[in-house]
Amino acid sequence: MKRYNGKLILFGEYSMIFGSEALLTPYYSVFGEWSSVINRPSETALESNANIRNFYEYLCNDDTFKILDLRRLGMELDAGLSFDSNIPLGYGVGSSGALVAAIFDRYKLIEINETSKLKDFLAKMECYFHGSSSGMDPLQCYWGKPFILSQRTTDNGQQLSILDDDFMSEDIHIFLIDTKIKSPTAPLVEHFKELREDTSYLDKFDNEYVPLVSKCIKSMTDKKDDEFFNYLLQLSKLQLELLTHTIPEETRDFFLTDIKEDGFQVKLCGAGGGGFLLGFTKDMEKTNNYWQDTEYHIHWVK
């Protein structure tokens, strides 16, 4: 049975909604796969079947989704279809993206070969869960490989470049910090869009934040570690300033940690508001020692 892994937005959360570069990678530790209430009867499977049915009704009410075999989906739901997933909800690691990718993959009647059109179609599907979507999460879950989405241009739109699994330095390790707070994405994204209506905020975001996203991506994939951690610290501080509403108050000091003094650095993971925070380090032992004396649990990604 095919698995649809979770995803991590390493760089580009929020900014990619408006066409910035983004770097995404699979989160292999969590995944979803098709199952059946009949084969695995449980309250969770019944709830999954009911949730997919609600999504199915949304898809049926929009002609955009005619390229999906919705008749078959409806019949299989009647027969007990469910999606067995251990991807945590409200944690920014692709719970809805994996389901969208799985439905598209299983029920598509035609292929969508152009990346931008595929992304837009998946975004329209995922809007059901978040109110708005860039389409990047389900695209990542669908491809199942790390990739960079280029900055949008007038001429070429956005191009997708698949990366090798060793796209970053072997000395950099990634971990997730569990804030123990579940958070819905839609209100956070809507508030961000409202903030962008202020011209001074928009200017700082587009002219300082977005270029830093690109610098983080380039320095990481060029394996220039010192440059990377320097740009990452600048980005984290700007997230603290420009995306304060997405960072739980009790975790804000983490965004000021410096690799040189603390041994690790922290940024948002997905929409924020809780869920996981994303950490980067070159010293796993020192990082483990730091977090074992706190109330937070960490999960190693790489």
Predicted features by range, described:
Residues 98-110:
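Stable alpha-helical structural segments in soluble proteins, enriched in small hydrophobic residues
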